[in-house]
Design a protein with these regions (language model features):
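N-terminal targeting sequences that direct proteins away from the cytosol to non-cytosolic compartments
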Residues: 14-94, 121-147
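Sec-dependent bacterial lipoprotein signal peptides
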Residues: 1-15
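Short linear sequence motifs
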Residues: 7-8, 34, 39, 44, ...
Length: 147
């Protein structure tokens, strides 16, 4: 009897943890689809504005020095990095761009110090994003290691 109760408790803990994890993941996706999130282009409400912001930001010089989680980065003029999700945001419109900086390694990365890398992720399928990301990659010395 005791074993059955213990098994039920363990089983219910697993499902409770699974529900908590699902809620966390859902919150991350919801946040990413907000106006200033990296996936704002997936939200019909912001799609057109995001595409226009990408075109506009692509034309700007990449010369703004900022600090992000202990690393100095150079990004496009009149943009900032969203502290919650790490994606770039256009200051003029408030739209999030599908270019995200990570404080961990990625295919396109930069070594900061021994065993510490920063990465950049971007959606190259969206017109203008590849061009903009390449400017930022070049300005910051990121290297693609996953060709």
């Amino acid at each position: 009897m005791t074993i059955v109760i213990m098994l039920l408790m363990l089983s219910s803990c697993y499902y409770f943890n699974q529900v908590v994890d699902d809620i966390k993941e859902s919150n991350i996706m919801t946040r990413a689809r907000k106006k200033d999130g990296g996936n704002a282009y997936q939200n019909d409400k912001y799609k057109e504005g995001t595409y226009e912001a990408i075109k506009d930001v692509s034309k700007r010089p990449v010369n703004k020095k900022i600090q992000f989680e202990g690393m100095e980065l150079i990004i496009s003029e009149n943009t900032y990095i969203n502290d919650k999700s790490g994606n770039m945001v256009d200051l003029k419109t408030g739209y999030g761009l599908p270019i995200t900086f990570l404080n961990k390694s990625a295919c396109t990365k930069k070594k900061v110090r021994e065993n510490v890398y920063y990465g950049i992720l971007y959606n190259e399928k969206i017109p203008g994003v590849e061009e903009l990301a390449q400017k930022i990659i070049k300005a910051n010395g990121f290297v693609n290691t996953c060709k």
